[in-house]
């Protein structure tokens, strides 16, 4: 029988001497979820950010004190500061806290504290963390386990990226971008894949990145469980170094949890799961692409190990309503002779872009793909330049927005004009450069044909363009949003 929230609060040990917790950069996707859980546990929460957002408004409605702008006075009365890796010691709030000997802890350390007295499930990997974590939350809820979760994206069904549950389970993303996942000590850890990204954290040394993942897995107790995607060659390579119980998953014949008979029909993907000692299980997910089959397999592996029955697994996967900005279908835009399907996606690494393109080709093979892409960070564009040129050239029509800098200075030869030139040189596609987001609607409308899929993709401010297109007078304003079949 599930416990009441009050009972959970009584069971979970409180942090001694901590009454008010202050978040610097509270609106960030990795910060607001932890803040919400702490609010629900009864702590006083305050935080600052450079601007208001849906996240800060939500936290404020729950009782958090929100400051717009970073000022030393915001810290008054705080017992601890929580900071993301984007915040440095020059920040006036951090500087005052250090001067007054108020503890300043990384976001991941606070997440680790929440996980300390729970059965923690941490999802790591370069790609697929948010979707896998969200699927786990859905399946555990369907199994009656009511988990606490902290996710890097908004669950469509829950309308939030975090929730305090009544069970002992805490499901969270484990962030390798700044190596902060080493703070976590979960009972179960997933590694979806290991790819070259955020390499500045690792001094440009891919070997160091691999070793850090091994170190993360060794944070598991000797009786814990590492759930590993054996289809990923780098994950397969590190398995012999992991001195912990393991379960593998993938399409490979030697995977412990394996998918066969995959079939995609538009947004829904069907497949059969093979597990040692279990009957074959037919499941479906309302998400396109083999990459989402892999995310579901990781979920199934953990749910099976935790004793969730097959009926709940099937239900939790089938009813999963998706995550914000992960192949999120906004509706249809009217064009001459019909309409186009408008999709928004967060993918910002060549491997993620390739997976989404493959999903589109698999679910809608007869449709053209019109892609609007915004590279994220000049350093990533430079480091993966040739891969971007290759994969972006696979669309039918391509519009490239300028690189979203994410605080970086421009790097010569790593901007979108240069990308356009390099893709054009291949002779298969003539990309269009989009200097500003407001220019997109008039540029893209003449290019669209009835039946096209219009995909806006990237991790920067392109995330606001899909809803803007729906409201654009060029596409009929708000009347353009019609439910997609």
Curated annotation (Swiss-Prot):
Catalytic reaction annotation: UDP-N-acetyl-alpha-D-muramate + L-alanine + ATP = UDP-N-acetyl-alpha-D-muramoyl-L-alanine + ADP + phosphate + H(+)
A single GO BP: peptidoglycan biosynthetic process
Subcellular location, record wording: Cytoplasm
Main location: cytoplasm
One Pfam family matching this protein: Mur_ligase_C
Known pathway: Cell wall biogenesis; peptidoglycan biosynthesis
Transmembrane parts of this sequence: none
Positions that bind ATP: 125-131
Matching InterPro entries: Mur-like_cat_sf, Mur_ligase_C, Mur_ligase_C_dom_sf, Mur_ligase_cen, Mur_ligase_N, MurCDEF_pg_biosynth, UDP-N-AcMur_Ala_ligase_MurC
EC identifiers of the protein: 6.3.2.8
SUPFAM superfamilies: MurCD N-terminal domain, MurD-like peptide ligases, catalytic domain, MurD-like peptide ligases, peptide-binding domain
Name of the top EC class for this enzyme: ligase
Role this protein plays: Cell wall formation.
NCBIfam families xref list: murC (TIGR01082)
The name this protein goes by in its record: UDP-N-acetylmuramate--L-alanine ligase
Organism, scientific name: Stutzerimonas stutzeri (strain A1501)
Lineage of the organism: Bacteria, Pseudomonadati, Pseudomonadota, Gammaproteobacteria, Pseudomonadales
């Amino acid at each position: 029988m599930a416990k009441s929230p009050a009972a959970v609060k009584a069971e979970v040990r409180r942090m001694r001497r901590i009454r008010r917790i202050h978040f610097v950069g509270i609106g960030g996707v990795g910060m607001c979820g932890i803040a919400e859980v702490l609010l629900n546990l009864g702590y006083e929460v305050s935080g600052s950010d450079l601007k208001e957002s849906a996240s800060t408004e939500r936290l404020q409605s729950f009782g958090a004190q929100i400051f717009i702008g970073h000022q030393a006075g915001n810290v008054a009365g705080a017992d601890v500061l929580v900071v993301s890796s984007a915040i440095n010691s020059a920040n006036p709030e951090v500087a005052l806290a250090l001067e007054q000997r108020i503890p300043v802890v990384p976001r991941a350390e606070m997440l680790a504290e929440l996980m300390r007295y729970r059965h923690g499930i941490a999802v790591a990997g370069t790609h697929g963390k948010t979707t896998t974590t969200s699927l786990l939350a859905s399946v555990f809820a369907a199994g009656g386990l009511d988990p606490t979760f902290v996710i890097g994206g908004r669950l469509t069904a829950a309308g939030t990226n975090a929730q305090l549950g009544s069970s002992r389970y805490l499901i969270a993303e484990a962030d390798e971008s700044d190596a902060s996942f080493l703070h976590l000590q979960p009972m179960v850890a997933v590694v979806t894949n290991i790819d070259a990204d955020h390499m500045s954290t690792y001094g440009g040394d891919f070997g160091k990145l691999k070793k850090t993942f091994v170190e993360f897995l060794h944070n598991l107790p000797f009786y814990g469980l590492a759930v590993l995607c054996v289809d990923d060659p780098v994950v397969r390579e590190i398995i012999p170094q992991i001195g912990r119980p393991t379960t593998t998953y993938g399409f490979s014949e030697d995977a412990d949890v394996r998918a066969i008979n995959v079939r995609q029909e538009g947004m829904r993907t069907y497949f059969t799961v093979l597990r040692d000692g279990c009957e074959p299980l037919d499941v479906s997910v309302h998400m396109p692409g083999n990459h989402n089959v892999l995310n579901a397999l990781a979920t199934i592996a953990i749910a099976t190990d935790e004793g969730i029955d097959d009926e709940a697994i099937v239900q939790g996967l089938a009813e999963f309503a998706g995550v914000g900005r992960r192949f999120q279908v906004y509706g249809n835009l009217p064009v001459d002779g019909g309409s186009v399907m408008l999709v928004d996606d967060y993918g910002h690494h060549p491997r993620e872009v390739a997976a989404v393109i493959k999903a589109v080709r698999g679910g809608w093979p007869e449709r053209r793909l019109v892609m609007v892409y915004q590279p994220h960070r000049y350093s990533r564009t430079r480091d993966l330049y040739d891969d971007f040129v290759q994969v972006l050239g696979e669309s039918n029509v391509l519009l490239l927005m300028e690189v979203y800098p994410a605080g970086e200075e421009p790097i010569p030869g790593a901007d979108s004009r240069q990308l356009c030139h390099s893709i054009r040189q291949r002779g298969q596609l003539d990309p269009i450069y989009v200097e500003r987001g407001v220019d997109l609607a008039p540029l893209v409308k003449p290019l669209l044909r009835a039946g096209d899929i219009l995909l806006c993709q990237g991790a920067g401010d392109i995330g606001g363009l899909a809803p803007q297109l729906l409201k654009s007078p060029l596409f009929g304003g708000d009347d353009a949003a019609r439910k997609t079949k």
